[in-house]
């Protein structure tokens, strides 16, 4: 190490990086035929410190991968019931991200693992969208939800399939590396089924054509996306996104699919000795457990698309008890949400067990699943929530069965009455 001060006979040493002499700096550290001063060392440390957060962030985004049981436990906090669907999803998602890690480390000669996209089948309001949203939030990966009914073939009015990738990029602030490991949920996939088995002279721009366009995206392709969401024009640079590692989850109600399955599984009989079983004896949930790829093809999905979604899971119809649980148990349960809303007015909300069952029965009658719960509860409380801000002495709002069944106003408990009691 060369000190700052030296005799005049000694040769003056200079920093190999900034060129300052040993007399201009505090310390000059010697290496094999090179020197570095203390100022350059400080500058190097600053550069390293600035780069560390982004490196740590990238490491965290691929950090410890939760196990299938941990993924399912997290789904249990938000989604009631649907045990088979949650287990299937947990394993599929775990294997997908495990595959990506293997791909990063694997050599050229190792076994290449194929991607397993997921198809969720279930009636409306059974939790398909919520499952996908909860998964993405837990894994901290970019997530986008697309509606298949708005998609058309490229060149026609409407959204083309590459808009899905553009939305995914927007959701992660145009970080290409993160977007390529994201999750895409395509809802209403059953609405783009082929209109019939017979080819038509008219072009089906929102049916089979969209399925063909989705096929390449789901399988894995290089999608060209305009930077920062601009319109496409010939003289601009495009962002190239590889969709090979994006996990696609498709969902749909597939109304009428149960008839296709029943026609395949139930043998028709004729004559006095034939065993005739009523189709009404089995629930929709039981029928969907016997689903085969050929049923989806008969329904109107093209065989290539069905083949790209090897993980097929059916969600059960929600029972009355399950709907009551949905009202009260999840982290974001509706009863908790409305209790918080009224608590902001200094009022307590009590919904009696009989009222909860009445709400569940009403939702079942509407055939909208869990999606109908909010509108029923909102309808019963709308008048009370309108009057509460102008009323100062209400302590509690009580919703009983008559409030739901007979559209009566909720009971109001006033503070004076509460004190006397």
Curated annotation (Swiss-Prot):
Q: Which GO molecular function, any one, fits this protein according to its record?
A: ATP binding
Q: Which InterPro entries match?
A: AAA+_ATPase, ATP-dep_Clp_protease_ClpX, ATPase_AAA_core, Clp_ATPase_C, Clp_protease_ATP-bd_su_ClpX, ClpX_bact, P-loop_NTPase, Znf_CppX_C4
Which residues hold ATP?
Answer: 123-130
Which Pfam families does the entry mention? Answer: AAA_2, ClpB_D2-small, zf-C4_ClpX
Cite the PROSITE patterns for this sequence: CLPX_ZB (PS51902)
Q: Which UniProt keywords apply?
A: ATP-binding, Chaperone, Metal-binding, Nucleotide-binding, Zinc
Q: Which family does it belong to?
A: Belongs to the ClpX chaperone family.
Q: How does it assemble?
A: Component of the ClpX-ClpP complex. Forms a hexameric ring that, in the presence of ATP, binds to fourteen ClpP subunits assembled into a disk-like structure with a central cavity, resembling the structure of eukaryotic proteasomes.
Q: What is the protein name given in its UniProt record?
A: ATP-dependent Clp protease ATP-binding subunit ClpX
